[in-house]
Swiss-Prot record:
Keyword Acyltransferase: no
Regulation: Inhibited by 5-methyltetrahydrofolate monoglutamate and by 5-methyltetrahydrofolate pentaglutamate, inhibition is much more effective by the pentaglutamate form than by the monoglutamate form. Two molecules of 5-methyltetrahydrofolate are bound per tetramer. The binding sites are localized between subunits. Inhibitor binding may preclude movements of the polypeptide chain that are necessary for enzyme activity.
Name of the protein this chain belongs to: Glycine N-methyltransferase
Modified residues (N6-succinyllysine): K46, K191, K196, K201
Modified residues (Phosphotyrosine): Y34
EC number in record: 2.1.1.20
Subunit structure: Homotetramer.
Residues modified to N-acetylvaline: V2
Gene (name only): Gnmt
InterPro entries referenced in this protein's UniProt entry, alphabetically: Gly/Sar_N_MeTrfase, Methyltranfer_dom, SAM-dependent_MTases_sf
Superkingdom of the organism of origin: Eukaryota
């Protein structure tokens, strides 16, 4: 029988409040395999992020979408003072495990990890005088749906995130190239700029429209899982994640508004300066905002 319900996430994943799309544990486990550890980060990404933070004299960093902690671990290893938060306790357990395993290293013993929600971030996180940099990378912000249909929760979340940045500090936030996805129905053909994973076998893209407006993009991942076959051979695991399709122009307006317009803003396409109409089609847009007041 045909399933008449369009499932936006893998079964067992929470659907109330800010959705934890990794709540069943299995998606979190497979995602950890997919992204790997800090060694699986591309050299280009690592060099770009570390260079950006050091160029602006950043030391105290808030990772507002730390997931399993892979970016935070990289920053802690590089000498930054890091606070890491995420709404998914299933994802955070991997970060907490790494901190425990490396607790004898002072930098890891001082690493702060908390569960927090973007919609209540101003209450969940004590920012003090603000962080030198706040990062929200890996298409993480697109996990927040537009439940009310007016993007009010997007605006609230971005305002809360921006409030964590000290005057003169940075917000670094990204999203996939949804302009391309919505116009073609598939993701750009380039490589993943963040992960060197060789376990991905297939990613299927679907676009859900409501009243002729793109409302959601779902990605169905098929990932090779080593040693799960009956004879010890690799098996396969599938899971679905849903995202709000932020287009470049509209997201630019949202994120600038979060700072009340008091910011310097630049857009990169796959870590390179982006110019509308350029020949190269980026997989990700990265927004770098410097708070000016």
């Amino acid at each position: 029988m045909v399933d008449s319900v369009y499932r936006t996430r893998s079964l067992g994943v929470a659907a109330e409040g800010l959705p934890d799309q990794y709540a069943d544990g299995e998606a979190a486990r497979v995602w950890q395999l997919y992204i790997g550890d800090t060694r699986s980060r591309t050299a280009e990404y690592k060099a770009w992020l570390l260079g950006l933070l050091r160029q602006h004299g950043c030391h105290r960093v808030l990772d507002v979408a730390c997931g399993t902690g892979v970016d935070s671990i990289m920053l802690v290893e590089e000498g930054f003072s890091v606070m890491s938060v995420d709404a998914s306790d299933k994802m955070l357990k991997y970060a907490l495990k790494e901190r425990w395993n490396r607790r004898k290293e002072p930098s890891f013993d001082n690493w702060v990890i908390e569960e927090a929600n973007w919609l209540t971030l101003d209450k969940d996180v004590l920012s003090g005088d603000g962080f030198d940099a706040v990062i929200c990378l890996g298409n993480s912000f697109a996990h927040l749906p537009d439940c009310k249909g007016d993007q009010s929760e997007h605006r609230l979340a971005l305002k809360n995130i921006a409030s964590m940045v000290r005057p003169g500090g940075l917000l670094v936030i990204d999203h996939r190239n949804y302009d391309y996805i919505l116009s073609t129905g598939c993701a750009p053909p380039g490589k993943n700029i963040y992960y060197k994973s060789d376990l991905t076998k297939d990613i299927t893209t679907s676009v859900l429209t409501v009243n002729n407006k793109a409302h959601m993009v779902t990605l169905d991942y098929t990932v090779q899982v080593p040693g799960t076959g009956r004879d010890g051979s690799p098996g396969f695991s599938k899971f679905r994640l849903s995202y709000y399709p932020h287009c470049l122009a509209s997201f630019t307006e949202l994120v600038r508004a979060a700072f009340g317009g008091r910011c310097q803003h630049s857009v990169l396409g796959d870590f390179k300066p982006y110019k509308p109409g350029q020949a190269y089609v980026p997989c990700y847009f990265i927004h770098v905002l410097k708070k000016t007041d």
